[in-house]
């Protein structure tokens, strides 16, 4: 050791006190300084040591050898201890120490010697380091002898090897503890997380001890080693090595050299500091720690942290139990433990690195603190918007951080290891705090403290807005009092009104009382709730600043009178409604929170009240009697007492704007009646204001609202209003109104806005589409909706939405874009563009038989919507409900109607309920119960390749666009590393379909973690907040079963009432029928004479004969069924006699011709039927009636679901054309499509949407048709049976063999027939294969079908079903069709066109000279093939009127004859072929009778009357060449007879029609020249009558 340079510290210069670089990087030693606390590095020139030894007498003549000295390492440590162990001088500072008295931590002033503390710490850290070397170590024992000053530290685990060092030739324990610069931590290539680094450690303790003993046992060598050093390690005793059995352990016992630290022994402060360090070990080393033989109760880091928070509470005087979130812990990595607590306004930290107590923090503390402060800064910015920006250091002052970390090869500022300098990148691990950790932090008081600090910081800003006693204010909205701001200002009154409209009333009153003492200022909406607002928010609130300026208020000033203010009184003038009460409350809240002393000044705050109802007699301008009411309960009580009096008129004053200027002047002339002073605020009333407006009092508000009882109102007859009465009797009405608007009823599951919409729709019987914006206007006018129509439009849209996650049963039918699951309804179109109507299903839910039993609300004396509906099933469970009110919120998921109906039936049968789980229509994912009242909704994800996954369902109410945004964020990798490469979007408005590509590495990780978890494809929904209004008050239900039981009880009562009501009504009808029968019979028998008598006499006679009077005149109409009943006009002077006479109008109003014996017989039959009906109802129980309604409901539910599924299948099976412009290909014609269709189980009747079948099969199908002549053939479908009435009219195949008629094109550019409404030239329609079959109208139909299929009820064109037809009527004499007539053929028209086509001249343009027709997909028609496949009928019916078989039609060619992309083969001509025999040739029917007279017909030349575009009138149509009119008689002169022509027609159409056509491609495009307009809403056409 003597050969070593005492200043050579090259082995440890990476971690020297001058080293600020990571390990293994060398740095030149800087120039040393006198008394420096930093160790020295390599020194080449000893001249650098100048100044090491101080000279007190520099004038002495000393030689150079004495001046320059070289010390040994040991001598240098003793000479300059501050370089190694810190200062040896006593230091006083505030530190955390252990208090034996309070048995906890204590933050106090401590006087200690840092060097002494450090040598003890080195031994403790060595013991803790052994835990990293041997994981089996589990105990540390520390013994402190206060009397002798001796300290010992014992630990088990692997001991020090008792072996001879091969190089140093000494035992290893002696080498480690008795020789400097020895360590096992010099290999920086090893990633060690121990505290030892420099090779000093325990040797420093030995050096500064008078006695130092090491004792260790090696179980492998079975030896025990003990050795003692004395006199500052200068004397070493002989090692004692003995044989021993037992476990390994190491024990260090030392007695510090207190003299070198200026101490005589251990004092109280040092003992407290040593004990705190022992407790540090217990909390951080993860081993059992004993102090003086007793086990320390601290088991983990969290318990250790709680010692500090208890001390903080104790210092505050809070001796209560710790809060739930007082200490928040997080351990995102095995090497990190992080704790958070709220500080008292200064940043505090307690941290450990490898069990070393880091008193000055360092990079590890900054690493954690920066993350927390960054998250807190985000929240501060959100909650303190537009306020003063806080710096991170200001936020840091409010947090207390605990860190226990294991850092690889840590570097410190000095050997004292008070501050870590290792860079974050070299920690060897990461500690990214979890999101849940942040959420828990935000729930503590830290945010409140930070915001409070921000508010204090903003005080200066608020003082800038303080008002002063100025005589003039610059604000155009303010009408200032003339004396405001003067010495008489305290007599002035500032009137605050609710909006500009109310300002007019105040201004009119101001004119009465004079402008000198009254000022007026209108408020804009509701005042800010300053109870939980920041100062920045208040400072930016213009209304509050205006009030401060106008009154002259100064921030935080205490007022005892108003003499220093511009206004001495503040008058609130608002509407007498709930919102007006809320505005008053907000103003009171502002004054109490900001200027509480003002509310203790008498007469400062007053309110101006106006009547809410006025009643009078006589002329409203000059009434004989008049009375005003200031509350509705007060008016209702008066009405109950005086309702029988006649002549009273009433008027509701819903707002201050209802009052006229004359009314205002009357009010202000009687100020004593209309002014109500608020009583001075009492101390206990402050809590009431906080209860009403503080967010922290939400739970207390729930109880307050539940205690509300209907009929509560504030009595305005008192002179002064207390704040207690205002809160409990007036403001609570606003809270209740808010809850009623937001929380649904348990009976019908509706909120008032939804109820108003349904009431309006039921009242209007809204069966036709109406714009949403228009319906909102009707609802607002019908039901007195008092809020904006925008929210009402959203309510209507919500009732009609059907996408996954919305309604299970929608009451309104959507017609237009009402939103989808892409954005959760946010993608809904504007209310101006969408339509809705009542869904027919709605009356299955809200039965009309219940309407007379319901209680209706009233507004302004008029009946409006019901208080509550009583649906057949609990809609609150079927459609769910969500809402947030005052103090209450509600969240009820959707349930399956099938399950609900089954359980209702089980309740009727007395059986237990089956458990139900949430269910959403259309959701294909999995729903599982994950605990009591908790359900997990999982999406669907599956692995489709080595690097690919497919997502086909998302958790409920996770919208497609939101999930797509998340995928984009993952790809951007701004927050977290990306684990996906790309994705493909195949989503539709109803289906979810993502295909995601991943790297192989990430794919394996995702599979190991779970694909569902990796992509967050699950969401939990709870049923713990089932809040709803029961029939009496707001209630929180414990379970869904409780809601079912509550609904069951209410609904069953209504079924009993419904039965009684129906029996009562039936009995009335029976009595009327009986009286009518007896009345008519008596007249017939001559027992009653009604002629030549006065009405009064006749009424008296009827009463004498016991005819029952029915006073309702409306019932007289029912008495005569559909016959009109004569009602005599009322005479206001006739009085009770007239009322009595009207009661017999059901008899006297019967028509004279009904006074017959036949009528008597009919009435008797009706009486029998009615009696039978009554008996049937009597036998039914209320449960039976309910079960019948439930069956109707569930059958309709299933039918609607089946219909919706069928419509979706048909739309999905519709083909897609090839588009040369958009580069899309056709779909649906291949084997794969047929296979897919078969797999879906599609109805084979959906043929009109499928690709055409082969010609062979088509021909075979047609040959099965039965004979019977042309007319019999025309009356039936060729291959389908006649649909039954149960099918709802025509079947899908009713469209077979029908086409649009086409007129001759004799004249250039002539229109065959104009459509009933203009067509858009930009719209094309592709005629489908079903249209090919629509050639001949069906005989069975009473009227022909329109050219465009009518719309279904949901606004979409019907695809498969034709509208029901009425009975055929006689057809008048044919006349030329007008443009407004339908475009279809009946039997006679068909023959007329046949004859016209036969009369056309032959036109055979060269096919080679034709231009190639372009095709594009521009169709949205209902079927796949257009009528362009057929061309004119005469094109297929060759030979009619022609002897040579050539074509005689100049109509456009068959679509199949045109050249098509990818096919140059046209339709083979059949003109020269002879007619084949047909089974219809033997028919003897004379079809010539069907042909009109032989008057020659020329080609029609129709001049266009407007811009309507027809099928054949396009400028690009090169086939439509002008043709001269045919010569007269040409059709008759040509070869065949009319009958033969008809037979030829039949042959072509029935037997050989499909043979004539080549097999068309799966999807035929529409030729651009032949453009047709698709009318989505065709105008109804007049049906043509058949003769």
From Swiss-Prot:
Residue sites binding ATP per the record: 126, 155, 183-185, 196-203, 415-417
Residues that hold Mg(2+) 2 according to the record: 575, 577
Chain positions of site Transition state stabilizer: 832
Cofactor entry: Mg(2+); Mn(2+); Ca(2+)
Cellular compartment(s): Nucleus
Biased composition (Pro residues): 1558-1568
EC number(s) given by UniProt: 5.6.2.2
Alphabetized GO MF terms: ATP binding; DNA binding; DNA topoisomerase type II (double strand cut, ATP-hydrolyzing) activity; metal ion binding
Positions of the record's site feature: Interaction with DNA: 526, 529, 701-702, 751, 785, 791, 959
First-listed, main subcellular location of the protein, grouped into a coarse class: nucleus
Composition-biased stretches (Acidic residues): 1-15, 1321-1334, 1379-1391, 1419-1430, 1512-1521
Keywords attached to this entry: ATP-binding, DNA-binding, Isomerase, Magnesium, Metal-binding, Nucleotide-binding, Nucleus, Phosphoprotein, Topoisomerase
Region Interaction with DNA, annotated ranges: 381-383, 381-386, 1016-1025
UniProt feature, compositional bias: Low complexity: 1271-1280, 1524-1542
Record protein name field: DNA topoisomerase 2
Lineage: Eukaryota, Fungi, Dikarya, Ascomycota, Pezizomycotina
């Amino acid at each position: 050791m003597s050969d070593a340079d005492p200043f050579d510290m090259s082995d440890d210069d990476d971690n020297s006190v001058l080293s600020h670089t990571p390990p293994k990087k060398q740095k030149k030693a800087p120039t040393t300084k006198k008394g420096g606390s930093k160790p020295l590095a390599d020194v080449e020139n000893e001249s650098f040591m100048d100044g090491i030894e101080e000279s007190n007498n520099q004038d002495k003549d000393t030689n150079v050898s004495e001046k320059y000295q070289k010390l040994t390492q040991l001598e240098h440590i003793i000479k300059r201890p501050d370089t190694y162990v810190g200062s040896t001088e006593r230091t006083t500072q505030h530190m955390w120490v252990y208090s034996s008295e309070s048995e906890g931590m204590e933050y106090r002033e401590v006087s200690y010697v840092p060097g002494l503390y450090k040598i003890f710490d080195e031994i403790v850290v060595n013991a803790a380091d052994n835990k990293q070397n041997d994981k089996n170590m589990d105990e540390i024992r520390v013994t402190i002898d206060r009397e002798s000053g001796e300290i010992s530290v014992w630990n088990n685990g692997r001991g020090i090897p008792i072996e001879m060092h091969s190089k140093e030739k000494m035992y290893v324990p002696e080498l480690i503890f008795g020789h400097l610069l020895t360590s096992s931590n010099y290999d920086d290539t090893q990633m060690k997380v121990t505290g030892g680094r420099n090779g000093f450690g325990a040797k420093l303790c030995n050096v500064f001890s008078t006695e130092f003993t090491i004792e260790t046992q090696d179980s492998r060598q079975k030896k025990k080693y003990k050795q003692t050093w004395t006199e500052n390690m200068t004397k070493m005793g002989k090692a004692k090595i003995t044989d021993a059995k037992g476990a390994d352990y190491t024990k260090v016992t030392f007695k510090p050299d207190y003299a070198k630290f200026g101490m005589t022994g251990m004092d109280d402060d040092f003992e407290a500091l040593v004990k705190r360090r022992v407790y540090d070990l217990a909390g951080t080393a993860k081993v059992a720690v004993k102090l003086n033989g007793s086990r320390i109760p601290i088991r983990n880091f969290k318990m250790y942290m709680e010692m500090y928070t208890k001390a903080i509470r104790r210092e505050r005087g809070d001796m209560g139990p710790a809060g739930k979130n007082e200490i928040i812990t997080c351990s995102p990595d095995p090497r990190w433990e992080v704790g958070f607590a709220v500080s008292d306004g200064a940043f505090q930290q307690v941290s450990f690195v490898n069990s070393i107590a880091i008193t000055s923090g360092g990079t590890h503390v900054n690493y954690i603190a920066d993350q927390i402060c960054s998250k807190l800064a985000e929240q501060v910015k959100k909650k303190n918007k537009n306020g003063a920006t806080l710096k991170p250091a200001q936020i840091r002052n409010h947090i207390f951080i605990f860190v226990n970390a294991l850092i690889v090869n840590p570097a410190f500022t000095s050997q004292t290891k008070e501050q870590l300098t290792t860079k974050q990148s070299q920690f060897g691990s990461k500690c990214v705090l979890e999101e849940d950790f942040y959420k828990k932090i935000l729930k503590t008081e830290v945010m409140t403290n930070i915001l409070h600090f921000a508010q204090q910081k903003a005080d200066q800003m608020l003082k800038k807005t303080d008002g002063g006693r100025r005589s003039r204010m610059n604000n155009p909205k303010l009408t200032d009092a003339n004396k405001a701001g003067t010495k008489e200002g305290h007599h002035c009154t500032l009137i605050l009104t609710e909006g500009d409209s109310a300002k007019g009333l105040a201004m009119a009153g101001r004119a009465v009382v004079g402008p000198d003492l009254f000022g007026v200022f209108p408020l804009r909406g509701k005042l800010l709730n300053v109870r939980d607002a920041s100062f920045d928010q208040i400072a930016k609130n213009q209304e509050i600043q205006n009030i401060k300026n106008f009154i002259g208020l100064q921030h935080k000033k205490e007022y005892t009178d108003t003499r220093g203010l511009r206004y001495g009184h503040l008058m609130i003038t608002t509407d007498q409604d709930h919102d007006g009460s809320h505005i008053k409350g907000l103003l009171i809240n502002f004054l109490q929170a900001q200027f509480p002393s003002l509310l203790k000044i008498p007469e400062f705050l007053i309110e101006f009240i106006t009547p809410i109802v006025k009643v009078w007699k006589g002329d409203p301008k000059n009434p004989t009697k008049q009375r005003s009411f200031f509350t509705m309960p007060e008016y209702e009580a008066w009405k109950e007492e005086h309702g029988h009096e006649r002549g009273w008129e009433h008027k509701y004053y819903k707002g201050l704007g209802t009052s006229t200027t004359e009314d205002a002047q009357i009010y202000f002339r009687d100020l004593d009646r209309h002014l109500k002073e608020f009583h001075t605020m009492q101390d206990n009333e402050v809590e009431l204001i906080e209860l009403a407006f503080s967010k922290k009092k939400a739970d207390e508000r729930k109880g307050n609202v539940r205690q509300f009882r209907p009929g509560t109102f504030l009595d305005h007859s008192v002179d002064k209003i207390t704040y207690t009465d205002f809160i409990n009797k007036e403001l609570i009405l606003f809270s209740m109104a808010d809850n009623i608007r937001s929380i649904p009823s348990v009976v019908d599951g509706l909120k008032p806005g939804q109820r108003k919409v349904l009431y309006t729709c039921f009242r209007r019987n809204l069966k036709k589409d109406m714009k949403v914006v228009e319906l909102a206007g009707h609802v607002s006018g019908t039901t007195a909706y008092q809020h904006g129509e925008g929210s009402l439009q959203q309510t209507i849209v919500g009732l009609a939405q059907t996408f996954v996650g919305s309604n299970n049963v929608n009451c309104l039918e959507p017609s237009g874009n009402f939103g989808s699951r892409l954005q959760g309804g946010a993608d809904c179109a504007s209310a101006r563009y969408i339509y809705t109507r009542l869904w027919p299903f709605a009356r299955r839910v809200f039965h009309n038989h219940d309407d007379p039993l319901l209680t209706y609300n009233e507004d302004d004396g008029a009946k409006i919507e019901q208080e509550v509906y009583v649906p057949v099933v609990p809609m609150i469970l079927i459609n769910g409900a969500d809402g947030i009110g005052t103090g209450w919120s509600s969240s009820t998921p959707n349930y399956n109607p099938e399950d609900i109906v089954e359980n209702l039936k089980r309740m009727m049968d007395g059986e237990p309920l089956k458990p139900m789980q949430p269910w959403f229509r259309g959701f294909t994912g999995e729903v599982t119960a994950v605990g009591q009242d908790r359900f997990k909704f999982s999406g669907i994800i599956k692995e489709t390749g080595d690097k690919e996954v497919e997502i086909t369902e998302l958790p409920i109410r996770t919208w497609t666009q939101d999930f797509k945004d998340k995928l984009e964020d993952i790809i951007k990798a701004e927050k977290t590393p990306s684990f996906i490469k790309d994705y493909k979007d195949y989503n539709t408005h109803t289906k979810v379909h993502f295909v995601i590509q991943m790297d192989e590495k990430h794919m394996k990780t995702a599979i190991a973690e779970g694909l569902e978890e990796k992509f967050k494809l699950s969401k939990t929904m709870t049923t713990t907040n089932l809040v709803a209004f029961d029939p009496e008050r707001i209630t929180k239900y414990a379970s869904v079963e409780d809601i079912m039981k509550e609904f069951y009880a209410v609904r069953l009562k209504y079924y009993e009432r419904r039965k009684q009501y129906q029996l009562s009504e039936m009995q009335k009808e029976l009595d009327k029928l009986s009286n009518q029968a007896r009345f008519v019979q008596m007249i017939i028998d001559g027992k009653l004479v009604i002629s030549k008598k006065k009405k009064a006499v006749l009424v008296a006679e009827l009463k004498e004969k016991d005819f029952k009077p029915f006073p309702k005149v409306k019932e007289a109409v029912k008495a005569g069924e559909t016959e009109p009943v004569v009602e005599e006009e009322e005479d206001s002077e006739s009085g009770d006699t007239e009322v009595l006479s009207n009661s017999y109008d059901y008899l006297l109003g019967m028509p004279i011709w009904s006074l017959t014996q036949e009528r008597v017989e009919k009435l008797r039959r009706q009486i029998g039927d009615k009696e039978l009906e009554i008996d049937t109802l009597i036998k039914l129980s209320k449960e039976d009636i309910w079960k019948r309604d439930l069956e109707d409901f569930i059958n309709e539910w299933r039918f609607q679901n089946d219909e919706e599924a069928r419509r979706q299948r048909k739309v999905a099976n519709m083909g897609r054309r090839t588009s040369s412009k958009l580069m899309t290909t056709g779909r649906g014609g291949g084997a794969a499509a047929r296979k897919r269709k078969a797999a879906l189980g599609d109805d084979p009747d959906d043929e009109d949407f499928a690709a055409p079948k082969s010609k062979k099969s088509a021909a075979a199908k047609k040959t099965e048709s039965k004979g019977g002549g042309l007319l019999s053939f025309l009356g039936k479908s060729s291959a389908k049976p006649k649909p039954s009435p149960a099918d709802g009219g025509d079947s899908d195949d009713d469209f077979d063999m029908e086409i649009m008629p086409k007129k001759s094109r004799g004249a250039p550019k002539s229109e065959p027939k104009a459509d009933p409404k203009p067509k858009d030239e930009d719209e094309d329609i592709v005629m489908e294969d079903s249209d090919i079959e629509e050639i001949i109208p069906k005989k069975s139909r009473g009227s022909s079908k329109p050219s465009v299929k009518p719309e279904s009820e949901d606004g979409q064109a019907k695809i498969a079903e034709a509208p029901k037809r009425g009975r055929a009527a006689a057809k008048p004499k044919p006349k030329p069709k007008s443009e407004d007539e339908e475009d279809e053929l009946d039997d006679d028209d068909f023959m007329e066109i046949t004859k016209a086509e036969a009369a056309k001249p032959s036109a055979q343009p060269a096919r080679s000279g034709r231009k190639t027709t372009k095709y594009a997909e521009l169709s949205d028609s209902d079927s796949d093939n257009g009528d362009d496949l057929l061309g004119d009928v005469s094109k297929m019916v060759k030979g009619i009127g022609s002897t040579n078989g050539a074509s005689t039609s100049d109509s456009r060619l068959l679509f199949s004859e045109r050249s098509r992309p990818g096919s140059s083969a046209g339709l083979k001509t059949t003109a020269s072929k002879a007619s084949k025999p047909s089974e219809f040739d033997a028919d003897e029917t004379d079809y010539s009778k069907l042909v009109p007279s032989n008057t020659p017909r020329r080609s029609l030349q129709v001049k266009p009357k407007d811009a309507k575009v027809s099928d054949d009138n396009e400028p690009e149509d090169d086939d439509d060449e002008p043709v001269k009119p045919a010569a007269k008689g040409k059709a008759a002169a040509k070869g065949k007879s009319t009958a033969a022509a008809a037979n030829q027609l039949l042959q072509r159409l029935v037997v050989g029609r499909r043979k004539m056509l080549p097999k068309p491609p799966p999807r035929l495009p529409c030729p651009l020249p032949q453009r047709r307009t698709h009318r989505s809403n065709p105008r109804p056409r007049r049906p043509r009558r058949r003769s």
